[in-house]
Amino acid sequence: MKFTNLTAKEFGAFTDSMPYSHFTQTVGHYELKLAEGYETHLVGIKNNNNEVIAACLLTAVPVMKVFKYFYSNRGPVIDYENQELVHFFFNELSKYVKKHRCLYLHIDPYLPYQYLNHDGEITGNAGNDWFFDKMSNLGFEHTGFHKGFDPVLQIRYHSVLDLKDKTADDIIKNMDGLRKRNTKKVKKNGVKVRYLSEEELPIFRSFMEDTSESKAFADRDDKFYYNRLKYYKDRVLVPLAYINFDEYIKELNEERDILNKDLNKALKDIEKRPENKKAHNKRDNLQQQLDANEQKIEEGKRLQEEHGNELPISAGFFFINPFEVVYYAGGTSNAFRHFAGSYAVQWEMINYALNHGIDRYNFYGVSGKFTEDAEDAGVVKFKKGYNAEIIEYVGDFIKPINKPVYAAYTALKKVKDRIF
């Protein structure tokens, strides 16, 4: 085995072939970091047949003018079951970054620690407890099992839906009642989905603005999304849910005809048997449905006059690789939230994964707090409704490469933090 630099082609071919390969360990992310002006390294291990068996994208940032801070975002991509390979990789990686004036090395591997349900109850161990001892022996310090959303650290909890050996019907069957109803609702109510181009990205950004204002969370800036759409190319998809009013109103009219037919039947039953309470209840229920149907038709016609035949209502931002589809961000028009457009977006992308043989649908980050007053309690409930599970990752590890200078650096940083 040998530790070596990799070409972008070698790196991409290997990371695309591996499980637990995060979108930040892809050629698209490498090209993005180059364009942003970061010092970037592609490194890995090749076996005696010159085949890549481990890979890692590193970025380096200047620290204290002379030194550099090296970071591998969700790397390396490696067979973690091969502990000998893991030891060799991190040992050689430390030597490599030391040659490049590294002050300290930071990694947050895409490696599960344990599994939980959406109530925060542990359902299983991932079998990677050995990794903590291994990293400690190699000189890495674990930063702890942090919860919540941090501006610097990667989120430690993901909500993930397993699609392996499942059909679309299986997915719907396993949803809770609300998710099931809304998914079926958007399928029949004229809600369509198409993919936005770069020129149309402001539509998505406007929805994100609506959502961030209503739910009080900090969104990324425009540059973040535009750059990833540009450099990730077909590894980013931005599905837009919209109402086609011609189809929507047509379907409502067809529904009205059926309801009127059923109502007339109920009225005839009452004429025949006036004492039949069941027929009276059925009549009342059908009349309520007809009233609601008429309101929807009137609303549809009004909105069609105001907005034209197509009305954008929701959009999402997704990362794609052979391992998983990642729901990174999404927003919905507050004015048209009742059309449940976000469910159309989710259903489109779940089916995208199924149709492309991708076994994992990642709803992405949750805080890991699992309380009613958690900042993401509503989001957790939404993701739970799809019958997803929580994966908790091992977290962050830091290795001081130049120990004396790193000790001085951290001491100085603590003083600054106290002052400011």
Swiss-Prot record:
The keyword Ribosomal protein does not apply. It catalyses: beta-D-GlcNAc-(1->4)-Mur2Ac(oyl-L-Ala-D-isoglutaminyl-L-Lys-(N(6)-Gly)-D-Ala-D-Ala)-di-trans,octa-cis-undecaprenyl diphosphate + 2 glycyl-tRNA(Gly) = MurNAc-L-Ala-D-isoglutaminyl-L-Lys-(N(6)-tri-Gly)-D-Ala-D-Ala-diphospho-di-trans,octa-cis-undecaprenyl-GlcNAc + 2 tRNA(Gly) + 2 H(+). Its EC number is 2.3.2.17. Its main location: cytoplasm. Keywords: Acyltransferase, Antibiotic resistance, Cell shape, Cell wall biogenesis/degradation, Cytoplasm, Peptidoglycan synthesis, Transferase. GO terms for biological process: cell wall organization; peptidoglycan biosynthetic process; regulation of cell shape; response to antibiotic. It is found in: Cytoplasm. InterPro entries: Acyl_CoA_acyltransferase, FEMABX, PG_Glycine_Bridge_Synth, tRNA-bd_arm. Pfam families: FemAB. GO terms for molecular function: aminoacyltransferase activity; nucleotide binding. It comes from the Bacteria. One of its GO terms (cellular component) is cytoplasm. Catalyzes the formation of the pentaglycine interpeptide bridge, which is characteristic of the S.aureus peptidoglycan. Adds glycines 2 and 3 of the pentaglycine bridge, using glycyl-tRNA(Gly) as donor. Involved in resistance to methicillin. Homodimer. Interacts with FemB. Belongs to the FemABX family. This is Aminoacyltransferase FemA. The gene is femA.
